[in-house]
């Protein structure tokens, strides 16, 4: 048998695993449903109904019931980290770097031309980031049909949104830090 010392993130993952938890499932006893941003919860409800994930009846419940239905409240009645990331106004209060950073680089890795940061609840970060990337960072082929301007981007917005969501979730859950986008 060999003895091995583990520290840092590896130790945290091991301890959580022995408790049957994941990083995003850690309870936050000092956070309550009333601390969550109402606009973010409302945005979630609207998007869920519009995309057919939930019905109008599903979202006509109290915020506490919604969080419970989404499994964002643990067995002791505490909100978990995932709820805070998705709906809390300032998730950086709880998790350092819980924001998206976007950079436009010139000819080299050290040639940062300009950058932006997107803060707030994760549910809002995604839409704000997609809008920012499509208006400021991504180039489109432009065509005209009569007087109407038609922009054709390299990625369909829904596909880019999915890529962005995967990058954010993967980064936040494994590293617990900021997600970054790089455009060269």
Indicate where each model-derived feature is located.
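Conserved N-terminal catalytic/coupling substructures associated with nucleotide/phosphate chemistry
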Residues: 1-184
């Amino acid at each position: 048998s060999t003895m091995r010392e583990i520290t840092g993130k590896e130790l945290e993952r091991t301890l959580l695993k022995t408790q049957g938890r994941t990083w995003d499932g850690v309870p936050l006893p000092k956070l309550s449903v009333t601390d969550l941003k109402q606009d973010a919860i409302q945005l979630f409800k609207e998007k869920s109904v519009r995309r057919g994930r939930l019905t109008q009846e599903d979202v006509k419940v109290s915020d506490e019931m919604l969080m419970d239905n989404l499994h964002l409240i643990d067995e002791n009645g505490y909100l978990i980290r995932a709820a805070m990331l998705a709906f809390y106004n300032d998730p950086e209060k709880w998790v350092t770097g819980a924001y998206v950073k976007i950079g436009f680089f010139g000819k080299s890795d050290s040639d940062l031309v300009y950058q932006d940061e997107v803060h707030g609840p994760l549910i809002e970060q995604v839409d704000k980031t997609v809008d920012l990337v499509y208006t400021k960072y991504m180039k489109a082929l432009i065509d005209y049909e009569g007087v109407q301007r038609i922009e054709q981007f390299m990625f369909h917005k829904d596909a880019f949104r999915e890529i962005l969501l995967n990058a954010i979730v993967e980064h936040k859950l494994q590293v617990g830090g900021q997600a970054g986008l790089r455009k060269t």
